[in-house]
């Protein structure tokens, strides 16, 4: 979010990190629910707009530690009276979150992880080390920015560099031979140009060719086997006088 101070081209910025996949939570009436929980900052729904169906406005709601927003899918399980109620982490009974609102479900055709529960980022210190203000070693976060319409991402590069040299120990890193830089990647190119996806495409393609080759070889072996069997049958018939 600091990027907005250095880059006026940025309309909104957010970051989030995983809390727990398949998080088991216990309601006040001892029901157990399960969902993917992520720690999100207060600008999360500015970058990824979702209609807030019930509850507090996220700009204030996600600023308060232990507040959380649940998906409409979970609302169907918990009921409309869940606002303001506490949910307890089954594994850590001393950790509680309060339902501050309900957001519209994210569509299935998104590269974002499945988010059922958005927990206010200030909660992080109760679960793990609070490195929100660290400029180095924060690779656990996913960061996104929304640019003003018509903005060329390349125009942000000088200001991003200035931001890094102002806040991070860049000279010290360079002296040690390390590199640290930030670049912007359009969301709509992630699926098409991700190195991981390219590798996986090659792996699946190779696997498909192997399966096809095995199927062809099996067919050839079956044909050869049937021909040999047929030849043996003919030889047997001739031994007994068949023409």
Which residues fall in each region the model found?
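N-terminal membrane-entry
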Residues: 194-211
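Short linear loop/turn motifs
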Residues: 17, 57-65
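Membrane-helix interface segments
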Residues: 31-32, 198-200, 230-231, 243
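Structural preference for long, well-ordered alpha-helical segments in enzyme cores
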Residues: 3, 74, 99, 159-163, ...
């Amino acid at each position: 979010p600091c990027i907005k101070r250095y880059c006026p081209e940025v309309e909104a910025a957010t970051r989030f990190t995983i809390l727990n996949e398949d998080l088991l939570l216990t309601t006040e009436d001892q029901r157990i629910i399960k969902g993917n929980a992520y720690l999100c900052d207060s600008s999360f729904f500015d970058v990824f707009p979702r209609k807030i169906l019930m509850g507090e406005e996220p700009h204030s709601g996600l600023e308060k530690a232990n507040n959380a927003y649940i998906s409409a899918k979970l609302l169907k399980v918990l009921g409309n009276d869940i606002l303001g109620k506490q949910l307890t982490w089954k594994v850590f009974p001393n950790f509680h979150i309060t339902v501050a609102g309900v957001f519209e479900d994210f569509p299935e055709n998104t590269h974002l992880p499945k988010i059922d529960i958005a927990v206010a980022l200030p909660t992080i210190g109760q679960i793990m080390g609070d490195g929100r203000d660290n400029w180095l070693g924060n690779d656990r976060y996913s960061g996104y920015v929304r640019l003003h319409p018509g903005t060329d991402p390349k125009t942000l590069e000088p200001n991003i560099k200035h931001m890094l040299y102002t806040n991070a120990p860049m000279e010290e890193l360079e002296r040690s031979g390390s590199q640290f830089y930030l670049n912007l990647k359009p969301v709509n190119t992630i699926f098409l140009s991700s190195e991981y996806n390219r590798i996986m495409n090659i792996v699946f393609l190779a696997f498909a060719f192997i399966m096809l080759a095995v199927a062809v070889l099996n067919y050839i072996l079956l044909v050869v086997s049937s021909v040999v069997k047929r030849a043996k049958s003919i030889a047997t018939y001739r031994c007994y006088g068949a023409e």
